[in-house]
Amino acid sequence: KRAHALFLFLETDPIGCLHSNVDYDVPGVDDKSTFEMSSGNYTGNRVGIKGSEDLGNGMTVGFVLENGFDSDDGSFDSNEDLFGREALLYVEGDFGKVGFGRMGILNSTAGSFAIGNFTPWGTGWGAVGDQSLIFGANIGSRWDNMISYRSPEFAGVQIHAQYSFGANTTGDEVEGKTTTDRYYALGATYKNGGLNLIGIVDSINEKHAAGTEDPDDTLRVTIGGSYDFGVVKPYLSAAYFKDARMKSWMDSYNTEGKTGTLDQLKGDWDGYGVIIGASAPLVGGTAHMTIGYMDAEAQKDYVATFDPNGADLTRYTFAIGYEYPLSKRTKVYADAGYFKDEMDYNSKDWIDRDPEGYQAAVGLVHFF
């Protein structure tokens, strides 16, 4: 009886998405390529439950629990956590919305507080739509022990804020201490008719062990927007990053060394990136396109294993895609993307590395 009474006041709904695709990938190194069935290219597979309860006086408490998995083999995604995509408890009222738990960062499209719709792809569509390849600062899309806030809307403007205490206390890492990375972000959005503007500043307070030098903290500033004209929706966005962790296309900079796999993009990078794109209705579906450019410079303390004098990196990306709805909850899609890097080491002892790669995929997505 108690359980029955609880569900009279607590509205709950199952949530989920099942997605499979076939893709052809050329990472851009050693002429290797793969042709395989995979999942999560368009968007991540998930299953979960969400619910809310009206507390009266304009107050609501709710939760979201989402498990991520790979549909091609049934294995856990998101570091094999049970609710690795999102584990959120929130309170909402006239003051706005406050959430606690594991959730996506502002500068992504993952979860209840994300606002990172800077391109037609968001942060989905695999490597083709991965805006962090251009925006630098390879910050994880989801963090544990997060507090998030979203303000009420004032004349189309909303303020967003986040802080993560870092990973749970395990081994040498202690939550909320300097031994674990901590994340924070501040953002603002503006909506007026077809106009959508976004600005986000986010950073990682880098961890360091006792008695070691405090590393420079990662900083990223991202601005962008779109305008829906009906016949076409153009996008324009740009990011500045400092002391950032660079991201590579499909691990194209990983090199086998004497001590294992080495990442030639490891280190602190300063630079900027720009993405232009558009979406447009086409034959009952929607077509998307983006072009990206990034220019970055590694610090002189880069990774001594490779080049202590630093390095310069220029990156170009191009992507197209098309999605077609079969129903309100099911769609098919196809996409293709290309990237090219121009890496110049500042030491004559190293050979410049200029990977060039491709990705193409077709898939089926069903939401429930």
Q: Whereabouts are the PLM-identified features?
A:
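Outer membrane beta-barrel
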Residues: 1, 6-21, 34-168, 180-182, ...
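Transmembrane beta-barrel strands of outer-membrane/channel proteins
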Residues: 12-22, 65-67, 102, 161-163, ...
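Gram-negative outer-membrane beta-barrel proteins
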Residues: 18-30, 69-75, 106-108, 167-171, ...
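Transmembrane beta-barrel outer-membrane domains
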Residues: 30, 38-44, 80-84, 138-142, ...
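Outer-membrane beta-barrel architecture
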Residues: 48-50, 88-92, 148-150, 187-189, ...
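Repeated loop/turn-to-beta-strand initiation elements of outer-membrane beta-barrel proteins
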Residues: 59-61, 95-99, 156-159, 194-199, ...
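Detector for outer-membrane/organellar transmembrane beta-barrel domains
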Residues: 185-319
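Outer-membrane beta-barrel "beta-signal"
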Residues: 355-368
